[in-house]
Amino acid sequence: AWGKNQFNNAFPIALACFMFSQQIKPIYIRLEKRNTEHNYIAVDQIFQINPLDPQAFFAFEHSYHPYTELIIGKTPAIDVVISNLQNSQIINAFEIKLTAIPDNTTAILSDHLQGCEIVIRPDTIVYLALSIAKIFQQNSSVLLDILDPICARISDWEDVTSIKPMIPVFCELLYTIFDRYQSAQIPILLQPIWKTQGKLSILHENCLDLFVWSNFALAKVFLDASIKPSEKSITRPERTTVWLIKMLYDFAQNGKIDYKRTLDRITFNLKNDKAFAASGMVTRKYMNSPELHNPRIKRHLIKHIIINGGQRYLSPERRLDSAIVSTPSLFEDGL
């Protein structure tokens, strides 16, 4: 059987390859003047290589070595690293989030109000920080000029009472970076969606599609949840905002990011199992589109995505696997 991560990472790449073969462009969610906007973007433009080229190689759960010089310690693994076997060049890397629509919070709503939950892990925020730091690699003093007037005032980054009032200011600092360097944002996260018939584990006829988030657009999700601070303790999105600012400030000062120290020490009594989660009620406003309401890949086309009998390696205890296994007719030749 395929392990959970094997399927959850390999299936989305197979979906992207299939969409490329059919000339169907994923939806690119990017930041434009502090709001998210959608564009269509070709898969080969995302990957920076023809995904069907025999020289295109996909390494799952590997470190992305181009960021090694920006970091203290070992670069954390990312879901997929893409390279060109012809010249051994590492081209790109992405986090992958295979998500179901609707989620529990939107399952009883009509199609145009449904959304999918997305859970972001801490290492994704590390890669988000690295992708921004890369912009300033040749001139980190520019980043320091933006951050230092505020960040230099902070004597203890682990103290809730001193950090909490600063979080809206941190949000504004990040938006200042995004405003000035909008053209430098890059794709960072692949989010395939698979649609079911309400709460049933039955695939919708309009079943699959692919969204791609830029690094700046992904940051907007937790910034929007942080810009008006909660009255009580620091929330996960707020902590994520602090993580990002602290890692960028470290880079601006020292030219490297000590991500393990940041994640391990700045906890605010929250577990580090995830950076933050956003329910379908939240994500739908960023993803709202005809493709979210009616994904473009029909369910009978799954047999062209999972090929060579791959369905026999599925694990039915997982939701998407179960939905596919429960519909064996998907792989009949007549469809």
UniProtKB/Swiss-Prot annotation:
Record's keyword terms, sorted: Endonuclease, Hydrolase, Nuclease, Restriction system
GO MF term set: DNA binding; type II site-specific deoxyribonuclease activity
Catalytic activity reported: Endonucleolytic cleavage of DNA to give specific double-stranded fragments with terminal 5'-phosphates
EC number: 3.1.21.4
Name of the protein: Type II restriction enzyme HgiGI
GO biological process terms, semicolon-separated: DNA restriction-modification system
Source species of the chain: Herpetosiphon aurantiacus (Herpetosiphon giganteus)
Group of enzyme by EC: hydrolase
Alphabetical list of Pfam families matching this protein: RE_HindVP
Matching InterPro entries: Restrct_endonuc_II_HindVP (IPR019044)
Gene it is expressed from: hgiGIR
